[in-house]
Amino acid sequence: MKLKATLTLAAATLVLAACDQSSSANKSTAQTEAKSSSNNTFVYCTAKAPLGFSPALIIEGTSYNASSQQVYNRLVEFKKGSTDIEPALAESWEISDDGLSYTFHLRKGVKFHTTKEFTPTRDFNADDVVFSFQRQLDPNHPYHNVSKGTYPYFKAMKFPELLKSVEKVDDNTIRITLNKTDATFLASLGMDFISIYSAEYADSMLKAGKPETLDSRPVGTGPFVFVDYKTDQAIQYVAHENYWKGRTPLDRLVISIVPDATTRYAKLQAGTCDLILFPNVADLAKMKTDPKVQLLEQKGLNVAYIAFNTEKAPFDNVKVRQALNYAVDKKAIIEAVYQGAGTSAKNPLPPTIWSYNDEIQDYPYDPEKAKQLLAEAGYPNGFETDFWIQPVIRASNPNPKRMAELIMADWAKIGVKTNPVTYEWADYRKRAKEGELTAGIFGWSGDNGDPDNFLSPLLGSSNIGNSNMARFNNSEFDALLNEAIGLTNKEERAKLYKQAQVIVHNQAPWIPVAHSVGFAPLSPRVKGYVQSPFGYDAFYGVSVDGK
C-alpha cells in the first residue's frame, strides 16, 4: 500500500545520502534519455522522487517502485497482473493444523548483488530472513533504530502483535510462529515492507560505522542492481547477471523524475521515455489514438478519500461528518478530476475486491439535508476549518488540487468556510499521523488483495498515529476485523467485512470519493510489461524492440 503513505522526514535524508555517494562516472539524465532509443536501456518516467530506497522504512508507491519492485525479493510474491501469490525466495512451505506455525523451505543458490560498497561471500540463506524480520520486530536489534526507522507498514499490518517468533531451523529453513491465526499472513509476506535484506551487507556496514548505507544504497537479490541516484533527476540500475529467475532482457533501467505530465507525454512521443506514470487525464483520449503510444488500462485497487479527524471538533460529531458527505457532489468530481478515468466511491473498499458491500446506499448530493444536519449538530450557520490538500498526484487521485477546489466550493454552499493547507509530502503525512489534521485528502492502494488491507490500516484503532488518518476508534468495528482475520472461511469473513463497511458508512469518518482506473502509456515497442492490480511497476521480463 499501495497509501501508499510515507517515510518520516528523518528517514527521507537517506535519499540525499544515496546521492552523496553517487559515482561521477554515471551519465546525466538527459544523456541517458537520449540513449534510450539506441541501446538496451528502459526509461521509466515518473512524477516525483522516491522518499527512500529501504522498503522496511517506507509505505509509499513511488519509493517501492524504486526499491522493492526492482532490487529486492520476498519469501512469496504476487503473480504478474494478479493478487495470487507464488513461491519466490521460499520454494515451498507448510502450515500447521492450528494455523500458527509456518515452515518455509528457502531457495538455494540465490545470489545477492555485488556493488561498490559490498561483495557478498555467500548465497542467500535463513540468516537474511531472520535479520529482515527481527530488525523491525525487536527493539533491541542493532539495526532497529538505524535510519530512525519507525517501520510504519510493519506496524500497520500488526506484525509486532502477530509474530511470536522467527527462527532459523537450518540454513535453508525458517519457521515463523504466530500468536494467533491470521488469514492474511501468507499474502502479507508478498508485500514490499517485508522484502529480504542481506544480513551480511548489514553486518559489514555496521562494522564500518555507516549502518545507514544499508538503507540508502540498497543491495538485494532482485533483477536489477542499484547504481546511482541523482537527486530529483534519475535513478540508475543495471541488470543482475546472476538473478535466480534468469537475467532480465534489459541491460539498464533508468527511473527518470519528470514532474510535469505534459512533459512526460512529450518524452514518450519523442522516444526518450518508454513508460510514463500518472498521465494527464485530459490527454487520455488523444493517447488512445496516438500511434506512438500503447495505452493499457486496469480498474484500480484503490480509493481516494477525505479523512476527518474524529478526535477534533467539529469532526468529533457524527452529524457534522454526515452533513459534509451529503454536501459533496461526487458526480462533478468524477467528471472534472477523473474525466472518465474513475468511478465514485461509497465504501472504503473498491468494488474490485471481494466482500465489497454493494447494498450500501451512498450519501446522495443533498445540500439541504447537509444544512439540516449541521443545524442539528449545533452549527446552523456553518463553521470555519482548515482543509488539507494532498500535495502529490497518486494512483488514486490524478488532481488533488482540483478535487479540493470542488469540495471546498461545495462546502461553502452549506456555510462551511475552508482554509486550504498543504505541506511537502513527507511532512503532510507526518503531521496528519501526529493528529494535526482537521480534514484532508488522502488515498490508498491495496497491497495484497485482501479487504483487511484496507479496513485495518486505514480505520482500525490500533493504527491511530500511523495510517488511520481519521483517528477512527470504534470498538464494534475493531471486533469485526479481529474476528474476520482469525477465520479461514472466505464467505464468513466476507459477512463480517460487509458489516464493518456499514459501520463506516453510518459513522462517516471519511468521505469515500473515488476509485481510479490505472492507465499505463508506454511505447509500442515495449513487450512483456504487465500492469499490477496494486499499482506498482516491476520491469523484470520487459524488453523493448529495437534495443
Curated annotation (Swiss-Prot):
Residues 1-18 form the signal peptide. A lipid is attached at residue 19 (S-diacylglycerol cysteine). Pfam families: SBP_bac_5 (PF00496). Transmembrane segments: none annotated. GO terms for biological process: dipeptide transport. It is a lipid-anchor. Gene3D superfamilies: Dipeptide-binding Protein, Domain 1, Dipeptide-binding Protein, Domain 3, Periplasmic binding protein-like II. Coiled coil: none annotated. Its main location: membrane. GO terms for molecular function: peptide transmembrane transporter activity. It comes from the Bacteria. Important role in heme acquisition or metabolism. Belongs to the bacterial solute-binding protein 5 family. This is Heme-binding protein A. It comes from Haemophilus influenzae (strain ATCC 51907 / DSM 11121 / KW20 / Rd). The lineage of its organism: Bacteria, Pseudomonadati, Pseudomonadota, Gammaproteobacteria, Pasteurellales.
